[in-house]
Amino acid sequence: TNTGSSSTLDVTVTPVNDAPVAVVVAANGAEDPAQGIAVKLSATDGDGLANVKSFTVGTPTNGTFYTDAAMTKPVTGSIDAVNGEATIYFKPNENFNGTANFTYTATDSGNADGSNPLTSAPANGTVTVTAVNDAPEAIATTATGTEDPSVGIAVKLSATDMAGLAHVKSYTVGETANG
């Protein structure tokens, strides 16, 4: 039998900072864009999305990241997060198509007093760039011959095309000087 008295015990749990978790991201767009391909970085944090302070992005394969869609400000250092997200813009290398890979991390603002900020493990990101039909490029040529020939002077026309020579379907010849 219990003959003792009851009592109340107060337990105080002091919260500790939990590291954010950077989320795997994927984006896509066409090669040689006029505006950058938007890539949304994202992270979760057990302490709340507002606690995610910034992202740090690694160098992507086959292109460059910018902080603006006009692609005038390359990403350097960290990028501020708003509610666990930030958008950067990818410019693929000229005529690149395929998958560009990168990694990034998220950093939080730490404990309530700002101490002990934590960084997530790296998350993977991909940007899939689709090919577009590039215009062929004419190759300058010259031809020489004698004045007043009985038959015309042969001129070889040639061009290059990123998709292969089979894609060059026709040539248009304008007026010639002196002839």
Task: Map each language-model feature to its residues.
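C-terminal edge beta-strand
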Residues: 2-14, 112-132
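Conserved structural position at the C-terminal beta-strand
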Residues: 92, 106-108
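Low-complexity "stalk/linker" and mucin-like segments enriched in Ser/Thr/Pro/Ala/Gly
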Residues: 61-84, 177-179
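Exposed beta-strand face motif in extracellular beta-rich ectodomains
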Residues: 86, 98-102
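Extracellular ectodomain surface segments
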Residues: 5, 16-60, 66, 93, ...
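Exposed aromatic-hydrophobic patches
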Residues: 87-91
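Surface-exposed, short loops/turns at beta-strand junctions within beta-sandwich domains
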Residues: 82, 94-98
